[in-house]
Amino acid sequence: MSTVKLDRLTSIDAQLRLLAPKKVSEDDKLIEYDALLLDRFLDILQNLHGEDIKETVQELYEQSAEYERTHDPKKLEELGSMVTSLDAGDSIVVAKSFSHMLNLANLAEEVQISRRKRVKKVKKGDFMDENTAMTESDMEETLRRLIVDLKKSPQEIFETLKNQTVDLVFTAHPTQSVRRSLLQKHGRIRDCLAQLYAKDITPDDKQELDEALQREIQAAFRTDEIRRTQPTPQDEMRAGMSYFHETIWNGVPKFLRRLDTALKNIGITERVPYNAPLIQFSSWMGGDRDGNPRVTPEVTRDVCLLARMMAANMYFSQIDELMFELSMWRCTDELRERAEELHKYSKRDSKHYIEFWKQIPSSEPYRVILADVRDKLYYTRERSRQLLASEVSEIPVEATFTEIDQFLEPLELCYRSLCACGDRPVADGSLLDFMRQVATFGLCLVKLDIRQESERHTDVMDAITTHLGIGSYRDWTEEKRQDWLLSELRGKRPLFGPDLPRTDEIADVLDTINVIAELPSDSFGAYVISMATAPSDVLAVELLQRECKVKKPLRVVPLFEKLADLEAAPASMTRLFSVDWYKNRIDGKQEVMIGYSDSGKDAGRLSAAWQMYKVQEELLKVSKKFGVKLTMFHGRGGTVGRGGGPTHLAILAQPAETIGGSLRVTIQGEVIEQSFGEQHLCFRTLQRYTAATLEHGMNPPKSPKPEWRALLDQMAVVATEEYRSIVFKEPRFVEYFRLATPETEYGRMNIGSRPSKRKPSGGIESLRAIPWIFAWTQTRFHLPVWLGVGGALKHVLEKDIRNHNMLRDMYNNFPFFRVTIDLLEMVFAKGDPEIAALYDKLLVSEELQSFGERLRANYEDTKRRLLEVAGHKDLLEGDPYLKQRLRLRDPYITTLNVCQAYTLKRIRDPDFKVTERPHLSKEIMDAHKAAAELVKLNPTSEYAPGLEDTLILTMKGVAAGLQNTG
């Protein structure tokens, strides 16, 4: 082997140290973790595909690392020549390798973050990134601040805490680009790495863990990263529910127990009541039909039954353990009477149980009670299973649990009895954990929200009024619609019969509401109306629920998304609250959802964020005026462009009183894995939401000064105008966007069940927010996040020199503005206009090149002004740890970007000529044919062999590297 080859074997480790030459702190082992995982992977790569492939990967990395140091565009061209010279099989192997290395880098980072938090608290203000936003002692730190700094009493804190609610809503937004098969393997790699660096590890343990690590890395690399079929809504629901089984189910009682301990440490001897609604879970998976024709009424029914079956099964799997624990004979008379009554009717053996299958003696009264609970859980599970399989069940409803109170009553009886007999420590063990699970998850595991677009309800109403011969509802004014809807809601007559003419769309809406009427009411949460614009949107759904005989109507939640709809939201809610019928219907409680994604796409991030801040304030005023308790439902995505950002700071930056102890927020796509993929992540997530909601309520942020508001209003007007002048008013912008990004190829990733557009044809307006953000994220340009900000800053700074100091004051003293600017800074740190320029050079026609040049100049100007406002010389100078992490992963992402840009060129331009060098892994092809076999995984591709898979792998890799998709 040549000296050059020998040198290359250690080159990536050396490059890592050059990119991040010094440790950020004494506990920093990130480079060590990174180097170990890469070393193991490169050995595996050589064993599977040969030494030449390994050297090629290392050479590409070196070139990319050199580009990161110099930012010389020629280096990108050299990288391009290298990747285009690879044949189909080798191209897939290389793209797969870099994507895999980025996933390994993420895992190294997660282990380092977990270790860092155990060793040392993160310094105050280090919050740009979710992982460094707060320490593991969030709850204790929050309680300390409230008591020491704000002089709140422990009892006041306890009363506030036990009455607050955080509802986390899992959605199937198609942003999770990593397959579940790989996520599980990644979890095992993470565990192996963490254990390898444990202090008390023996040499034998170390050897076995190293072998296990290599095994899992190889298994992950050998797994096809690409979903070959599009997931169904049922697939998405099962994937989402797997987190409950793996982390959330046991994570909730663990978190609540830690909360008890934190409260005890401040002098509260009472435990958080088991039925305090601190944490709740909801889901849109199988209920969100907005723009997704695959979510049918049958899907909704199946998803609800599956969730009930899963819940009963998880309770059932724990009940034996509880029966083992509650073996005591001493009990209250109340419990003994119940046990004796049950004992009379339970003479038979139960051979289908493993434990306690014979009749339980009356001297074990708690077990007698729990055996009856177990029987009902068994039948509850089996009835759901049968209904799911064949739509009928031989098991009578009476043998099952149908109401949560039926389930809790015998458990409460056991708890009361244990406490009365001096066994409170036993009662506060597994029984309390179990009761907390029942109170949190109920019989349905999660409550399913239904989401439908307002236009679909208008279609139904139009069909009804036309059928009744009273005109076209669609043509009526808003006032006439409201008058008619209210007259029907106040009346008793049926509105339509089976003879109502129905299109498929109308049948879908009505059949969905019929499913709501058919299934147990505790299966459902809210009925969310997307693209809501007026009070009639809400009243129409209320009327449809009544017509379909929904016994316990779902609360109706308008979702205001576009800028104009957000501005009109307070007036809409004022009108609704003024209606006596509606006021009586809501019983003093109203939920309103605001959408971060579509508002950002409509007006740009800055304008949308400020408008949502103001609309929350206005909605709060309206609610207070009418004596209504308002709950804001935040439709946040994972990326900054879709409202993402560190949880704690995002909550604390909301206007004062708008949370008020009640918060709903979506947990979307890849954010589910980042929040609940591991036990410690689950614990951290529950802690952050609870702590931030408590702190916001007890220490509300100060309202911005009038002059700050005026300045932000000016900035929003300018930012919106600049954003729309390009995105919506430039006649050829859509053409440029589709050429300069992989937007048209997005659907090939098969990462979600819904189409990327609400309507098959149309421009940016009909494009969903996720592919819009996804496409710009892939090219590292992040246009939707920053476009308009530079123009806004320029306008106010040039208008009045004093605005410079005012902006600096806002940055230091206004949490909303601080978080907005810091998140923009983080996005710029992840961006690279030279990469975007490469896409333009290769993919954009000559007459449209000026678009990119103009936008890149705007990008640089915006970045400069942003740093000026923040008082920073360099990006992320206040967060060296995040800066280090981004620098370490940039060379991988850059290689994938170059590979992606050239692959898109080859796909879109059949005349693009490349010179392939001979197959790199020739020496082992005869034995394994590994690279060639990868090409065969996609036999039906419409493109030249290997191109489509290479493209998809680069998209997945870039998403993993930036830790954002859409």
From Swiss-Prot:
It is an enzyme of class 4 (lyase). It comes from the Eukaryota. Pfam families: PEPcase. NCBIfam families: PRK00009.1 (NF000584). Induction: By salt stress. Its cofactor is Mg(2+). Belongs to the PEPCase type 1 family. Keywords: Allosteric enzyme, Carbon dioxide fixation, Cytoplasm, Lyase, Magnesium, Phosphoprotein, Photosynthesis, Stress response. InterPro entries: PEP_COase, PEP_COase_bac/pln-type, PEP_COase_Lys_AS, PEPCASE_His_AS, Pyrv/PenolPyrv_kinase-like_dom. The gene is PPCA. The active site is at residues 173, 601. This isozyme is from salt-induced (CAM) plants. GO terms for molecular function: phosphoenolpyruvate carboxylase activity. Its EC number is 4.1.1.31. GO terms for cellular component: apoplast; chloroplast; cytosol. It is found in: Cytoplasm. It catalyses: oxaloacetate + phosphate = phosphoenolpyruvate + hydrogencarbonate. Its main location: cytoplasm. This is Phosphoenolpyruvate carboxylase 1. Homotetramer. One of its GO terms (biological process) is leaf development.
